[in-house]
């Protein structure tokens, strides 16, 4: 079966629309364009699709209502603009969806909602219930309360996290470019459009680095989002939002935009939460033997395989596991604090008691609490 056929068969979609598409050249929301996308999403919903919308535009809408000509730099002013604009954004969507007798719901998320296991499960339950009721949830980051340190970074990332959260089949990212290219089409008339690539194709990294084609126009963030979504088995489409009838055409399997497909089997719900958790508290550097055991045998991480410890963390918190070159291999929940881990790193499990004066676990991270990335 072709990869586009998988998209055609998918029925649970997350659709992300960026602010470059939603705003009318800095003059507030482009209601005419919003009406076009709402009509397309309504068509999917009427056909039985479960649709979740991740929408930018709150800050831009707020700037217009406040009479600000330039985007502010101060965080508190951005948050004020988001607070003012969010109501306008939701009201605009609600009015458009009402034309098709479709109800909407507003969902604001922050890191704590997705890093805390109980809140993560509550958010998942709410979103699933809404979509089963035929309601289209409109998701955005809770800009009014987040700080720079705990931001998702961009709504591409948020879209991928929502895709993981609801176990979506497809993440559709609408952008102001019609697809992804192997070089900048604005500078190279011979630039080739990327039709299909694995989300984990290393060639995408090569294009993204050192000012490569994907490093411009926010495309590298879309690659990262596709990789995050792929961990739960979702395929990602990056496609031009201004293409005529773009959403139904992509859903029908038509070759539009760039498909970044998943080669992964969907992982278990708990491990999907771990993979999408964006707030690690520390990092462990592993030796080659530990990396091999994790990758090839799927075993737990023992203290003997740890060479270095970075950060401050307590028991049960999330840490990254890296190889000696600094590449992330896995992430998981630790059984020992950073102080304890520093004392037992490089030691066999049989020595934990003598090094700490007690031993609660043989494993530093149990395989049930560890996910490869």
Curated annotation (Swiss-Prot):
Its EC number is 2.7.2.11. One of its GO terms (molecular function) is glutamate 5-kinase activity. SUPFAM superfamilies: Carbamate kinase-like, PUA domain-like. The gene is proB. GO terms for cellular component: cytosol. It comes from Saccharophagus degradans (strain 2-40 / ATCC 43961 / DSM 17024). It catalyses: L-glutamate + ATP = L-glutamyl 5-phosphate + ADP. Catalyzes the transfer of a phosphate group to glutamate to form L-glutamate 5-phosphate. PANTHER family: GLUTAMATE 5-KINASE, ISOPENTENYL PHOSPHATE KINASE. Pfam families: AA_kinase, PUA. It is found in: Cytoplasm. This is Glutamate 5-kinase. InterPro entries: AceGlu_kinase-like_sf, Asp/Glu/Uridylate_kinase, G5K_ProB, Glu/AcGlu_kinase, Glu_5kinase, Glu_5kinase/COase_Synthase, Glutamate_5-kinase_CS, PUA. Keywords: Amino-acid biosynthesis, ATP-binding, Cytoplasm, Kinase, Nucleotide-binding, Proline biosynthesis, Transferase. Gene3D superfamilies: Acetylglutamate kinase-like, PUA domain. Residues 281-359 form the PUA domain. CDD domains: AAK_G5K_ProB (cd04242), PUA_G5K (cd21157).
């Amino acid at each position: 079966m072709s990869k586009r056929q998988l998209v055609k068969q998918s029925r649970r979609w997350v659709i992300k629309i960026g602010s470059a598409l939603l705003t009318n050249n800095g003059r507030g929301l482009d209601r005419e364009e919003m009406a076009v996308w709402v009509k397309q999403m309504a068509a999917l919903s009427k056909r039985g699709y479960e649709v979740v919308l991740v929408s930018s535009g709150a800050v831009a809408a707020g700037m217009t209502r406040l009479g600000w000509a330039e985007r502010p730099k101060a965080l508190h002013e951005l948050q004020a603009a988001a607070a003012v604009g969010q109501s306008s954004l939701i009201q605009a969507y609600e009015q458009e969806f009402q034309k098709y007798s479709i109800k909407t719901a507003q969902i604001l998320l922050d890191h704590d909602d997705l890093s805390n296991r109980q809140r993560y499960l509550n958010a998942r339950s709410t979103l699933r219930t809404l979509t089963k009721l035929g309601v289209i949830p409109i998701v955005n980051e809770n800009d009014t309360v987040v700080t720079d340190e705990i931001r998702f970074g961009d709504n591409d990332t948020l879209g991928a996290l929502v895709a993981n959260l609801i176990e979506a089949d497809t993440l559709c990212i609408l952008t102001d470019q019609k697809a992804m290219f192997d070089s900048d089409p604005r500078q190279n008339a011979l630039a080739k459009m990327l039709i299909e690539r694995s989300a984990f194709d290393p060639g995408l990294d090569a294009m993204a680095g050192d000012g490569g084609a994907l490093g411009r126009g926010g495309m590298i963030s879309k690659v990262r989002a596709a990789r995050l979504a792929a961990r739960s088995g979702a395929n990602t489409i990056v496609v031009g939002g201004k293409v005529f009838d773009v959403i139904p055409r992509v859903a029908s399997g038509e070759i539009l935009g760039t498909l970044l497909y998943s080669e992964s089997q969907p992982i278990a719900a708990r491990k999907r939460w771990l993979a999408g958790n964006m707030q690690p508290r520390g990092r462990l550097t592993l030796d080659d033997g530990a990396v091999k055991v994790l990758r090839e045998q799927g075993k737990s991480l023992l203290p003997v395989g740890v060479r270095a410890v970075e950060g401050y963390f307590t028991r049960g918190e999330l840490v990254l596991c890296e190889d000696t070159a600094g590449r992330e291999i896995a992430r998981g929940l630790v059984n020992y604090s950073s102080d304890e881990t520093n004392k037992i790193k490089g030691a066999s499990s049989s020595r934990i008691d003598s090094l700490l004066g007690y031993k609660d676990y043989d494993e530093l991270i149990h395989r049930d609490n560890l996910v490869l990335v």
